[in-house]
Amino acid sequence: MDSAALEKMTGAKFPAVQGVIEEFSRDRVQNVLGDMRSRQVIKYAVGLSEASVQELRFNWPCFTWEEESVPLPPHPFAAYSRRAFTRWAIAQCGPVPIKDFGGNWFLHWQWQTGVHSCCPLLNPRDGAHQTRRELNMESYLRTHGPKYDKFNELSRPDLCHHRAEDCSVRAKAALSVDSAYDMGLKNTCKAMHRAGIELLHGNILFDPDMLIEAKMEGFVAGMNYHWKKTRRSTGLMSSFLEMGSSLFGVSNSSKEGEGHHDLKIKMGSSSTHMVPADWEISYHFRDDCVLGYTHNLADVLSIATGSYVKVGNTFYELERTGLKSGMLMYTITACKGLYDRASARSTPLSAKASTVIINGMSYQVGEKLDPISFPYLAASFYMQAQKAVFEVQQVVDLHTPNRNLWSWFKKKFELKAHAFLFALGLRDSHDEWLLDQIEFELNETVCTLPGEFLEPVSEVERLDAALEDWRRDRERLNGKSVENLKTLTVLVELAKKLGISAYEVLNSHQNESERPKDQWHVEAALFEAVELERAHWKMLTAEAQAMSLQDPLSREAKSKGWSYESSDSLPCAYAYVFSEGRFVKPADLKKKTRVLVSPSMQIMNQIRMAESLEKAIAMNVKSCKKTWIDGVAGCGKTYEIVHTADIFKKDDLILTANKKSQEDIFSQLKPGTDCAKRIRTVDSYLLKPDVQAKRLFIDEAGLVHPGKLLAAMRFAECDDCLLFGDSEQIPFVNIVESLQPAKFLKLEVDAREVRETTYRCPADVTATLATLYKKKKIVTKSKVLKSVTSKSLASASAVSGLDPHSWHLTMYQADKAELVRVARTNQMDDVWIKEHIKTVHEAQGISVPHVKLYRFKTFDQPLFDAAHAEAYRLVAISRHTQSFTYIGVNQHLCKADRMLKFVICQIP
């Protein structure tokens, strides 16, 4: 790409373009040019209302909006929104051949974009549009023609009158500006496949209320249009339209049944509502009594609720990227090769029950939703139920003799549907063989089983009967109350002792100066930890009742429903396990018995943890000196623990906040088996505090609730406790929304030591960390000067592979799930996935050579954008020793991204 090409592409002169090309990569130049192309001037008529102008500027801040003395176009706000979207989409596509499906060829000719327009004449309205554009072109030439030295400086309009799916012109990218109404998702993808198009940007007028059955009509204030659902008329108007279509020599695809299919959607009730091909939706603009549009309802809803279409060997994935003033924007991306879990993604719900895809964006359970997304959420729930029914039917169809049961489990359900073993009723002759293959200790998971022919249930009646028995038994499963009277009793006793109510123990600082400060804070922090564990238990069991008990055959249901009761006699918190052909309670088993569990089963130790913390409250308090080692990122806190603690003499005990930190210490110490009890996680030690020590070392102490830290000190009966962490990195995070932590998250310590030298962070990162750290300084010993880069993606689906030598981080679990999907598509090993793909919260404490941080959404995300989330960004940028790459979707749209601002400052 030379300077002349750049000048022609952007319409501007660049004296130093050649130097820019030499300094930056081709990708970066194209990104800069795309942003410059999008920052163009769009002129609007003087008569446009001020409110409309302000909304246009808010929706499209990348353009400069200027007045001009021209007549107002029909439905002006919609027209200018369409114009802005067209320019924005062209800029996103970059300097590649582009097609416009049914677009305005006059605008492309006027702007000299070189876009090919497919403008089929399907009815009289299309003919009127064609005539109007020809007149506009003639008027434009009369007005602006004299300024061109030669007429041939203006190229001829690049258009055809073929349908997009019939056009033979090839391209790399495409636009679909208000054109998908007549094509639907299926025909749009067919048109992309024929033309070799890899990326399409499109929009339609859409109101979420269209998904609700009771809403047969509505009004969208932004675009100022009415919509109404009707059945196709067979009267005089229908005859007139058919006659008009025949005059142009073409027939409407909806008349011939092309590109239309019955679409099941959720319309505000529990019943299934079919949308046959004769249902239509009409649009009428309030500020234009003449113009109106009628389209096939199924085609419109295919864009609003669809996910992917397979054409040949190519999958086309649809992502809805935004809803602006009644305009739904979306992208369709071609995915070559195997598409992982494509059958599961055919609905708006993802492959995990905790993740739902709404309006093209994935949300994790607990994330806040914009109210505009609620109708999408209702549609997603409906599609989830439909998929569960489909999967049950799949299972019934597979219940035939001589079927390879293990292959069926592995390929169809990946050991997540352990409830099937209960419902299938394995043949008695194979029970002993099955148990021999899965002999392991409690808390283990099933290893790879050899292929073996087993005979599942072949009678549907037996399957239904077994499931009905299981459903009737739910009261017994849910019989135990999670309330713990002992907890309430001790709480009341402490309240009486302090002279205040039980509520004030956890939520008030009144008259604090009159109480022994240290004792009061210690006991209050311990009680808060107890209440958090109990609230966490309630949250998980409530989720299990809502998800798992509905249908034991549903792959989407997390199998937390099996864990309702705890057992003090076993180191296993599963409430029910599969053993000897049936589900039984662990309390009824021997300690070394054989059991079957699955990766979806969750250990629930909350009640046992609460009981352990209560024991710590009742213990006699032993004085312990608490020292906080406050070190910057990469200062060698773990190294100091390893070389200071002497666990072989059994005088020291090392506890860590997570399993990864424990494994890191093990790998450096290489201790014998006798040391295993002295290098543990905090939770493991609190559940079984069977060793004591004079000195207690706690790594990443800031991630643990202070109540648990104090309980560990009491159980260890230590004289000194050294707490290692960074007071300005991620602190303890409460995941239980029903119980907000009180004011005891700050641990009172006797001494504080500071470590200000980092051996990990490169110089450019250290310079920024110096501005982020408020309580301490930071200097580096690293010889790496520059380590930070960035990369912008068109969409999340553009991530086709992962660097096996890098660690891949995300801020949110939903983005992590997307990376895991990509890794499994590329046949990455599960051990590698567990080690190399983490959230930033999970990665706190690690030190690795190369890090890539991903952001897949362009709307506001607090951990990237909010000022109060500096701790997360501090952790993210301080994990690497050599390189850090920030990868985001459409980064130029993320104006509030504080992480991106940091990265831009570091790039030379």
From Swiss-Prot:
Residues 66-304 form the Alphavirus-like MT domain. Residues 756-908 form the (+)RNA virus helicase C-terminal domain. It is found in: Host endoplasmic reticulum membrane. Its EC number is 3.6.4.-, 2.1.1.-. Residues 629-887 are annotated as: ATP-dependent helicase. GO terms for biological process: methylation; mRNA modification; RNA processing. Residues 599-755 form the (+)RNA virus helicase ATP-binding domain. It is a peripheral membrane protein. GO terms for cellular component: host cell endoplasmic reticulum membrane; membrane. Keywords: ATP-binding, Helicase, Host endoplasmic reticulum, Host membrane, Hydrolase, Membrane, Methyltransferase, Nucleotide-binding, Transferase. Residues 47-341 are annotated as: Methyltransferase. Interacts with RNA-directed RNA polymerase 2a. Involved in the virus replication. Contains a helicase domain and a methyltransferase domain. The methyltransferase domain is probably involved in viral RNA capping. Involved in the formation of ER membrane spherular invaginations in which RNA replication complexes form. This is Replication protein 1a. It comes from Olive latent virus 2 (isolate Italy) (OLV-2).
